[in-house]
């Protein structure tokens, strides 16, 4: 893709998301979603091979269906309340339809099937945009809709997403699919707290984006797509092997790393709302995800695969890939736990 075209497309993607973020009018929000969806498709098709085209088609069909359900919910709300503003969604049917549409855009269970397939069919850079930036707009609308959302509907979808993420990631060897199931699980954690304390969703989103960006950048730096290729990186990029270990454990929510903060605060908030069984079940479901993160960590950093070469380190040219953003992202993704008291004040 030529740079001027790429700049125009990325500007449209960012403009669509910003329109959703700053609007309180349902029609403008819907237009922002459509701008964002139509502009992201050329980015997904950047490779221009049959697999990327198939992934883009699946993404388009899912997002178009979600947009149709969202518009239907908006029209029902308009007929019931006579207003286009987001703060007036008194009709439970309209609210439920909008919630289902937004969760379909996010990839929550039972509408999660498109996320692993689309992520597997596109490049790592496109997958990074899909699993980070594309989550911001639907979550911002859920944040503003929080008072009118049915908590039972959203909580059931959140718990299903955590279970699906845990079971789905267990037998995966493709790194993109592992990160897709990781995204489904983290979306479940975010939406579980939306109704009870929406600001905690912000914290979880920020932490998730930092950890996912760092992981994708490391995989792009290593040019790794499978667990096997990642396991051979120890003698080419020894430092990145250690960094991947830290990031995987942080994504799994293991203390004392940064990924533990949102899980800790969400479980604490749900317990304050006299919910004991649900956070216990969520913590158990998180163990499934932690298992495949630990397995990936073990194959990457704790085993040494046999080599026919007597040299431990491989000879290679100097890597010219720029990783300017990687050091601060890794620091924030792994070492923010001591700053939890300040986050408690903010959130």
From Swiss-Prot:
Transmembrane intervals: 3-23, 25-45, 59-79, 111-131, 149-169, 200-220, 242-262, 274-294, 325-345
GO BP term (any one): mitochondrial electron transport, NADH to ubiquinone
EC number: 7.1.1.2
Membrane topology: Multi-pass membrane protein
Enzyme class: translocase
Main location: mitochondrion
Localization annotation: Mitochondrion inner membrane
GO cellular component: mitochondrial inner membrane
Keyword Isomerase: no
Gene Ontology molecular function: any one: NADH dehydrogenase (ubiquinone) activity
Family the entry assigns: Belongs to the complex I subunit 2 family.
Complex and partners: Core subunit of respiratory chain NADH dehydrogenase (Complex I) which is composed of 45 different subunits. Interacts with TMEM242.
Function: Core subunit of the mitochondrial membrane respiratory chain NADH dehydrogenase (Complex I) which catalyzes electron transfer from NADH through the respiratory chain, using ubiquinone as an electron acceptor. Essential for the catalytic activity and assembly of complex I.
Protein known as: NADH-ubiquinone oxidoreductase chain 2
Naturally occurring in which organism (per UniProt): Ailurus fulgens (Himalayan red panda)
